[in-house]
Amino acid sequence: YQLVLDRRIGEYRLPDGWSIIAAGNREKDKAVTHRMPSALANRMVHLEFDVSPDDWILWAQQAGIRREVIAFLRFRPKLLHDFDPLSSGKAFASPRSWAFLSGILDANPDPDVEYELFRGTVGDGAAAEFMGFLRVWRELPSVEDILANPADALVPDDPAALYAVCEALSEKAADGTVNALVTYAGRLPSEFGVL
């Protein structure tokens, strides 16, 4: 209680203006929690947060998360966090596990074990959907081809492929590519032209 009540730890005192923030798991999530003593709990404000796909994507773009992971989660935002505390499965989709999956992709795993690695990271359902998306992603026209020939480059029909192309192109937005991007975006279905 010393930190919360006295704003100090031993001889160290927190500077004026500093706030104390504690984070933890909810008991209902069955994620190694311990009940907080009521006297301590009564000295805090308790808030629950939902995962925001938009906020996570903003973070992911700056944190070096793979483009295909970001594109997939734009396409299927409900899979960013898919936790069921009653499930017996060990792996489940969460912001942390998607970041970990991005690291697996960085390691360029053998295609024969790739799906198993994904299953063991984000769970069965999310891994299956991601693998389907990844197959489409890997068959897309290259960004270089689109920028070189925006009026004639392939425009995919599949929504997953369109999300993937838009994500890849967003990484190339710069003064020298604006005209090509606008030309290509004008050929996309209207709901994708603004991505």
State where each predicted segment sits.
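C-terminal regulatory/interaction module of P-loop NTP-utilizing enzymes
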Residues: 1-195
